[in-house]
């Protein structure tokens, strides 16, 4: 289980105090959190309870990123140990694209969930899906809106304002981050589920009450991982409206239009990156890599966690481990469990 970094825990505890103190103290606390831009500090003062949800979203994103990359050379650990709300990774790589997208998705997800729980005073359930006197669906399957539908639009708006506020420069990296931020939070909205509950006598389903709910965040992480694998390289071009990112420059076939380039724009839901990924074999704070020395690997197999791939050709060490565990456990009436002690030995492989 991924553990919250000490700094993150301290920051969240600071923010939790805001609910119990005066507005003057809130201003002081928001001013003490490192990594915030002036715009983010203003948002903290205006709505401090939402910042608690953003801290939860940061944790969600960190846990999911580390789960998805747990067997890769780059395992998404170093970058989440820096300032909580500052830039999370400096290199404009494919991994940075995923990191920004999952962080933005986590922010939108957590704020939306906090609204549904009533933890943020300025939002609640989605009024567009509130209970209505008239039904819907078909005569065979009537239903109506009810319950508390997730107000994902509020979560997206707040996450956009807060996460995008740190992108102050108008350069290609900023455009990349903004694009991936949007892709992450938009995916949360697209993955909303419709849950229903049946009403009727003796288990019948005369009428269903339905509401919109958030999916498990693991599904969001899985979907973003697929987008990471299909992420597109972009380059910056300067046009009449300023700097923009394009996938590639293509030329029309035929002699008449052969010299006219065609700009291929990235799709809104695609993840994009500017730089090729480093190999992540060696420790580097600049790339967010801890290196692979000492990492546990699999001697057999050909996946990302295989010793051949993970150890970058340096080879691996083999350690013979022996331990005692409980085995052949039996329940005895009443009420205890008796177990034998068994010795087991196995080999563990770590990268040199």
UniProtKB/Swiss-Prot annotation:
GO molecular function: cytokine activity; frizzled binding; signaling receptor binding
Alphabetical keyword list: Developmental protein, Disulfide bond, Extracellular matrix, Glycoprotein, Lipoprotein, Secreted, Segmentation polarity protein, Signal, Wnt signaling pathway
Glycan-modified residues: 75, 119
Keyword Signal: yes
GO cellular component annotations of the record: extracellular region; extracellular space
Tissue-level expression: Dynamic expression pattern during embryogenesis. Expression is predominantly segmented, with expression also seen in the limb primordia and presumptive gonads. In embryonic tracheal cells, expression is close to and dorsal to the tracheal placode.
Family to which the UniProt record says this protein belongs: Belongs to the Wnt family.
Function text: Binds as a ligand to a family of frizzled seven-transmembrane receptors and acts through a cascade of genes on the nucleus. Segment polarity protein. May function in gonadogenesis and limb development. Wg and Wnt2 have a role in the developing trachea and together are responsible for all dorsal trunk formation.
Protein name as catalogued: Protein Wnt-2
């Amino acid at each position: 289980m991924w553990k919250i970094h000490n700094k993150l825990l301290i920051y969240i505890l600071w923010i939790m105090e805001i609910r119990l103190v005066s507005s003057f103290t809130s201003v002081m606390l928001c001013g003490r959190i490192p990594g915030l831009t002036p715009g983010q500090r203003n948002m903290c003062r205006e709505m401090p309870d939402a910042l608690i949800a953003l801290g939860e979203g940061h944790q969600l994103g960190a846990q999911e990123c580390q789960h998805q990359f747990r067997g890769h050379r780059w395992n998404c650990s170093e970058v989440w140990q820096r300032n909580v709300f500052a830039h999370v990774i400096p290199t404009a790589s494919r991994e940075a694209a995923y990191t920004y997208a999952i962080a933005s998705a986590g922010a939108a997800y957590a704020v939306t969930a906090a609204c549904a729980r009533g933890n943020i005073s300025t939002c609640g359930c989605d009024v567009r899906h509130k209970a209505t006197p008239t039904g819907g669906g078909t005569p065979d399957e009537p239903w109506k809106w009810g319950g508390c539908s997730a107000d994902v639009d509020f979560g997206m708006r707040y996450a956009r304002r807060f996460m995008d506020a740190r992108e102050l420069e108008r350069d290609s990296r900023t455009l990349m981050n903004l694009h991936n931020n949007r892709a992450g939070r938009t995916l949360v909205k697209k993955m909303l589920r419709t849950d229903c509950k049946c009403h009727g006598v003796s288990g019948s389903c005369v009428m269903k009450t339905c509401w919109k709910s958030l999916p498990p965040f693991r599904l969001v992480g899985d979907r973003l991982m697929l987008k990471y694998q299909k992420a597109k390289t972009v380059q910056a071009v300067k046009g009449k409206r300023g700097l923009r990112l394009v996938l590639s420059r293509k030329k029309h076939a035929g002699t008449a239009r052969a010299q006219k380039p065609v700009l291929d724009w990235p799709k809104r839901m695609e993840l994009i990156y500017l730089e090729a990924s480093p190999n992540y074999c060696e420790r580097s704070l600049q790339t967010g890599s801890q290196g692979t020395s000492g990492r546990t690997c699999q001697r057999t197999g050909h996946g990302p966690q295989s010793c051949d791939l993970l150890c970058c050709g340096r080879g691996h060490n083999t350690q013979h481990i022996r331990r005692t565990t409980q085995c052949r456990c039996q329940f005895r009436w009443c009420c205890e469990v008796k177990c034998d002690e068994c010795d087991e030995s196995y080999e563990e492989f770590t990268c040199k």
